[in-house]
């Protein structure tokens, strides 16, 4: 949905090595006298296991796994059943889409918080053309360019393009808070009006429009509603993203139709060619200052524009489209007590800041910050990460060591890694104050939504999300703005192709 240069959010120092209660150590206690005891820990040597699982017969195995993943079991049961079968959080399987879109669906799955971080180690894994998994969407959907998200840090263009994204974020930092306030005040006014008229209101459509308007206004200095694009942005982006992600999503159609339509053959890029051109024209017209910086970095205007479009529409808008409804769902389910605590904390700090939302004021809201981190832990906007082993590796789970051969593809499903019961208490629950206090803050290194630990920062040498701090900031702004205006809410939750579908059934103003 990534930022270090100017939106860097201060965190306590978490880089010192503090033994976790889950570390694989056996204590040895030596008594020297009646008054002194020395506790020495020694690591337990884990046994080496062959990676369990198999890929089945060519063609048939990948197809069967695809049907299980999407229809017969669903994602969670797909992984849980294999953990139980193999008695391991690391195993071999096929990942969609399989035939006939990808020639090699074979992966090694990592489903625990100990093994998962290897996917962030640029010295051990390569990220080239693995952003969407075992298949790569046609570059016809991105102007003929391999976009930043598909580049490995070792590729020359990676550094140039990531620097451009850092520049975009840092150069517009002063516009984020005021534009967010204006845009989301408009959204809340629309929700209020519809609630008065109908008694309930759908959240997703208005949230999508607000997200796109905010990104355009804050990062590019233009309100899209006042341009030729009008209010069409979210719909155009939705169709364009569908053409890229259809092999790994389901639309809820009848099983056979859904599988044949989405997972068997690539949909032709020509279906969204005119839509994409409208988006491209919008960004090209409003990126003059960014093109100057791009040319300094050795990037052409055309390549810069396609990358800016992708970063804004796919990464940022796509992330907000998925995450904001999921976060609101979790907050609603947290109940009135948490809502009251949030409202009191937020209103008190904003009042102390002279009635304005500031970065400093938000830093003094520990519960609000924890709620955002917990939402990112429970429902990360990007659930899957991939990497290709650069060399023969040994990867540890909590229970064993596994040997991986050079060239094998590693796949991590983050909602399992960030709900690891050996790291988190009540891992499947949304615990609003989980990250409050010194002990809570120590757990932030296990929040991994940004393609890296929350305690680390994006650089040109890694694949951590360039807008990491930006995403955290706008998520905090959403919670802060919401509880300045409202006291509590109730929602009904449905499903959508990307995330949750939210209907607000009650909304109490402050």
UniProtKB/Swiss-Prot annotation:
One of its GO terms (biological process) is defense response. Expressed in flower buds, leaves, roots, stems, petioles and cotyledons. Not detected in ripe fruits. Expressed in sieve elements. (13S)-hydroperoxy-(9Z,11E,15Z)-octadecatrienoate binds at residue 315. Disulfide bonds: none annotated. Heme b binds at residues 127, 158, 162, 463, 465. It is found in: Plastid, Chloroplast inner membrane. (13S)-hydroperoxy-(9Z,11E)-octadecadienoate binds at residues 315, 321. Its EC number is 4.2.1.92. It is a peripheral membrane protein. Keywords: Chloroplast, Fatty acid biosynthesis, Fatty acid metabolism, Heme, Iron, Lipid biosynthesis, Lipid metabolism, Lyase, Membrane, Metal-binding, Oxylipin biosynthesis, Plant defense, Plastid, Plastid inner membrane, Transit peptide. It is an enzyme of class 4 (lyase). Its cofactor is heme b. It holds the Pfam family p450. GO terms for cellular component: chloroplast inner membrane. This is Allene oxide synthase 2, chloroplastic. The lineage of its organism: Eukaryota, Viridiplantae, Streptophyta, Embryophyta, Tracheophyta. The gene is AOS2.
């Amino acid at each position: 949905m990534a930022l270090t240069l100017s939106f860097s959010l201060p965190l306590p120092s978490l880089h010192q090595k503090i033994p976790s209660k889950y570390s694989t150590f056996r204590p040895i206690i030596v008594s020297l006298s009646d008054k002194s005891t020395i506790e020495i820990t020694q690591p337990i040597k884990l046994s080496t296991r062959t990676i369990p699982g198999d890929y089945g017969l060519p063609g048939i195995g990948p197809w069967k796994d695809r049907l299980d993943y999407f229809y017969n079991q669903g994602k969670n049961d797909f992984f849980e059943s294999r953990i139980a079968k193999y008695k391991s959080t690391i195993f071999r399987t096929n990942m969609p889409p399989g035939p006939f879109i990808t020639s090699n669906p074979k992966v090694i799955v990592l489903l625990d918080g100990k093994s998962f971080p290897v996917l962030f180690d640029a010295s051990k894994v390569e990220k080239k053309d693995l952003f969407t998994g075992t298949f790569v969407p046609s570059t016809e959907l991105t102007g003929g360019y391999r976009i930043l998200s598909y580049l490995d840090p070792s590729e020359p263009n990676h550094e140039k393009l990531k620097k451009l994204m850092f520049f975009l974020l840092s150069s517009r930092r002063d516009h984020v808070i005021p534009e967010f306030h204006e845009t989301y005040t408009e959204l809340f006014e629309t929700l209020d009006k519809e609630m008065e008229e109908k008694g309930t209101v759908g959240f997703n459509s208005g949230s999508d429009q607000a997200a796109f308007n905010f990104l355009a206004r804050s990062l590019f200095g233009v309100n899209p509603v006042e341009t030729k694009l009008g209010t069409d942005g979210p719909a155009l982006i939705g169709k364009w993203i569908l053409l890229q992600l259809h092999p790994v999503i389901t639309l809820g159609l009848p099983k056979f139709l859904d599988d044949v339509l989405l997972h068997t053959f690539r949909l032709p890029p020509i279906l969204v060619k005119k839509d994409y051109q409208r988006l491209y024209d919008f960004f090209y017209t409003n990126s003059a200052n960014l093109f100057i910086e791009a040319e300094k970095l050795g990037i052409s205007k055309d390549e810069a524009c396609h990358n800016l479009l992708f970063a804004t529409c796919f990464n940022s808008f796509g992330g907000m489209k998925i995450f904001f409804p999921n976060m609101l769902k979790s907050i609603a389910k947290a109940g009135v007590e948490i809502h009251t605590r949030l409202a009191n904390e937020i209103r008190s700090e904003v009042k102390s800041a002279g009635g304005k939302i500031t970065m400093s004021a938000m830093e003094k809201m520990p519960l609000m910050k924890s709620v955002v981190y917990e939402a990112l832990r429970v429902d990360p906007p990007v659930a899957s990460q991939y990497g290709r082993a650069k060399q023969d590796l040994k990867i540890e789970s909590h229970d064993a060591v596994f040997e991986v051969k050079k060239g094998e593809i590693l796949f991590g499903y983050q909602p399992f890694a960030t709900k690891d019961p050996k790291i988190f208490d009540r891992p499947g629950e949304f615990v609003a104050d989980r990250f409050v206090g010194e002990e809570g803050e120590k757990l932030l290194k296990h929040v991994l939504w940004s393609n890296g630990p929350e305690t680390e920062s994006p650089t040109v040498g890694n694949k951590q999300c360039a807008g990491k701090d930006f995403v955290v900031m706008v998520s905090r702004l959403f919670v802060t703005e919401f509880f300045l205006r409202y006291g509590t809410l109730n929602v009904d939750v449905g499903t959508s192709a990307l995330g949750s579908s939210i209907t607000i059934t009650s909304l109490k103003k402050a």
